[in-house]
Amino acid sequence: MKILVPIDGSEFSKHSIEFVTSRATLLGHNPEIELLSVQAPVPARASKLIGNGSLSGYYDEEANVILEPAIEALKAAGVKATARYAVGEAAPTIAKVAEESGADLIIMGSHGRSALKGLLLGSVTNSVLALCDK
């Protein structure tokens, strides 16, 4: 089973990691767990000033701040995982990575907004649900 776990470093995404570590036996024998950090794109004007090499380094650093503690938490619980980052808008990027990687399951936190607030303010989780075919 391939499991995608998008995280952003928030308390809500930490709950996703806790969920995976506490329920590892329910996820099947040797599940393939991939952590994903979606980085917001730097505005075009700024990226021209920064340059591609520095921009890539910036994205690497930002993603590592989020991904490394999660990998360590999973490792401490005996759960193997890989990690990657992608640049883009959160929901469509998560859905795209899930499709490309053949993920069977996406485990992600939710901010716990009410249905009305989610409708009015939007929800990454709801958008991912709407965008995924599986």
Regions found by a protein language model. Name each.
Residues 96-134:
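Gly/Ser-rich helix-loop-strand patches that form or flank binding pockets
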Residues 53-65:
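A short acidic, glycine-rich active-site loop
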Residues 6, 84, 109:
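Active-site-adjacent beta-strand anchor residues
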Residues 20, 70, 94, 128:
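Aromatic/hydrophobic pocket-lining residues that form π-stacking "cages" and hydrophobic walls in ligand
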Residues 1-53, 77:
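Small/aliphatic-rich secondary-structure junction motif
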Residues 72-106:
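Structural beta-alpha unit
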Residues 21, 64, 68-75:
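Class I S-adenosyl-L-methionine
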